C-alpha cells in the first residue's frame, strides 16, 4: 500500500483483522481516532491518512490492551461498517488486511464486497503455509471464485526450528 502511494496512486487499507488489528501500529497511529465528517448530509467515518495511505481499523475504536470478544455477526457488522460508513473518496486501490484463516470475516467480505483479487501472504512456517493453502482453496471455490493475483512469503530468511 505504501509503495503504491509513493508512486502517486490513491490508496486505502481496511484492517479487517477484527480480533488482532495491526494497522494502527504499522502506520504509527496508535491512540489515533478517526473523525466523523458530513458527506451529502450523512455522517461518515473519515479514514486517517498516514504515509499517503488512508487507514481504517477496528483498532482505532478499541483499547489495545483489551481483547475484542465478539461473535461472528458482530465482527462482520463492524467490518462492513468500515466499508459502508466510511468516506474513502476516490481510490485507485483499496487493500483489505484479513486475519489468517477462513472464518466469518472472510465470508462476510466475499459475500458483501466485490473483490478484484487477493494476494495471499504467509511466512515459511508449516502452520502458516497450511493456513495459506486453505485460503487459496477457499478463494478458488466455485461459489467464491476470487482471482489470486499474488503470493508473498514474508520473512523468507526465517528458518523454523
Segments the model singles out, each with a brief description of its role:
Residues 15, 23, 56, 79, ...:
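Residue-level signature of catalytic and energy-coupling elements of molecular machines
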Residues 4, 9-65:
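Phosphate-binding loop that captures ATP/GTP phosphates
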Residues 3-4, 139:
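Hydrophobic alpha-helical packing residues
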Residues 59-109:
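Phosphate-binding/switch loop-helix module in NTP-utilizing enzymes
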Residues 7, 25-30, 59, 81-89, ...:
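Conserved, well-folded catalytic cores of nucleic-acid-processing
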Residues 18-21, 40-43, 51, 70-77, ...:
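Charged, alpha-helix-enriched surfaces in structured cytosolic catalytic cores
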Residues 24-28, 67-68, 107, 132:
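Short acidic, glycine/serine/threonine-rich loops at helix termini
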Amino acid at each position: 500500500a505504501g509503495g503504491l502511494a509513493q508512486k502517486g496512486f490513491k490508496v486505502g487499507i481496511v484492517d479487517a483483522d477484527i480480533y488482532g488489528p495491526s494497522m494502527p501500529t504499522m502506520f504509527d497511529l496508535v491512540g489515533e481516532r478517526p473523525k466523523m465528517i458530513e458527506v451529502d448530509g450523512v455522517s461518515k467515518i473519515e479514514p486517517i491518512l498516514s504515509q499517503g495511505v488512508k487507514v481504517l481499523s477496528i483498532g482505532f475504536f478499541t483499547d489495545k490492551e483489551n481483547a475484542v470478544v465478539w461473535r461472528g455477526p458482530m465482527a462482520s457488522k463492524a467490518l462492513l461498517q468500515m466499508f459502508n460508513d466510511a468516506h474513502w473518496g476516490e481510490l485507485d486501490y483499496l487493500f483489505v488486511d484479513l486475519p489468517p484463516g477462513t472464518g466469518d470475516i472472510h465470508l462476510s467480505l466475499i459475500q458483501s464486497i466485490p473483490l478484484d483479487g487477493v494476494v495471499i501472504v504467509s511466512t515459511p512456517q508449516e502452520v502458516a503455509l497450511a493456513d495459506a493453502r486453505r485460503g487459496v482453496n477457499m478463494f478458488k471455490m466455485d461459489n467464491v471464485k476470487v482471482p489470486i493475483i499474488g503470493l508473498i512469503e514474508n520473512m523468507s530468511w526465517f528458518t523454523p526450528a
